């Protein structure tokens, strides 16, 4: 179960202690458990939503979104901010884009992107709360983290060294394919058209990454996760 605990420590703000520095092979295997971490997040959000029944819808949605952000420690929002700054500031140049992405400072494009994404997610949750949200809360966190597995399975990692390279090089590819198949079938059962929307957004974002960078980075993977979560909740709110 060590790979699961590695995944949970990396993807969440939950207090997880590991017995020393994990080997690269275990780090790679941890990717297989990313969807399980997403499912855990979804279950916690579902439980929170159940406990918040009777709360005014705007407050209910705001508290759900706050819990959502706290569970991940805003890790992927940071990747989204860095990617937004780099994508517009890079002017189509690969090296400039990668250089800006490493800058820890956030520019106005990053701030605007974060505000818009969180605002849209809040509004979508507000709609879903009004409709009596249930098991659908499992979908977005699960799809977002399964997408990271799919991204590392089929996309080159362009930054040498670090966690991302270990994930890409030591991922058990056949097992990853089976995990993704199970995730897709489960999500199609729960979400229908919103899952197909997420698949389309995934394909589009991956195309943009490969065209600009020749692959992915940790920041663009985080941005992908955030935008797919948004696509799913928007699709559900729109009745897809």
Swiss-Prot record:
Its EC number is 2.7.8.26. Pfam families: CobS. One of its GO terms (biological process) is cobalamin biosynthetic process. The chain crosses the membrane at residues 31-51, 62-81, 109-129, 133-153, 179-199. Its cofactor is Mg(2+). GO terms for cellular component: plasma membrane. It catalyses: alpha-ribazole + adenosylcob(III)inamide-GDP = adenosylcob(III)alamin + GMP + H(+); alpha-ribazole 5'-phosphate + adenosylcob(III)inamide-GDP = adenosylcob(III)alamin 5'-phosphate + GMP + H(+). It is an enzyme of class 2 (transferase). Keywords: Cell inner membrane, Cell membrane, Cobalamin biosynthesis, Magnesium, Membrane, Transferase, Transmembrane, Transmembrane helix. Joins adenosylcobinamide-GDP and alpha-ribazole to generate adenosylcobalamin (Ado-cobalamin). Also synthesizes adenosylcobalamin 5'-phosphate from adenosylcobinamide-GDP and alpha-ribazole 5'-phosphate. This is Adenosylcobinamide-GDP ribazoletransferase. It comes from Pseudomonas putida (strain ATCC 700007 / DSM 6899 / JCM 31910 / BCRC 17059 / LMG 24140 / F1). The gene is cobS.
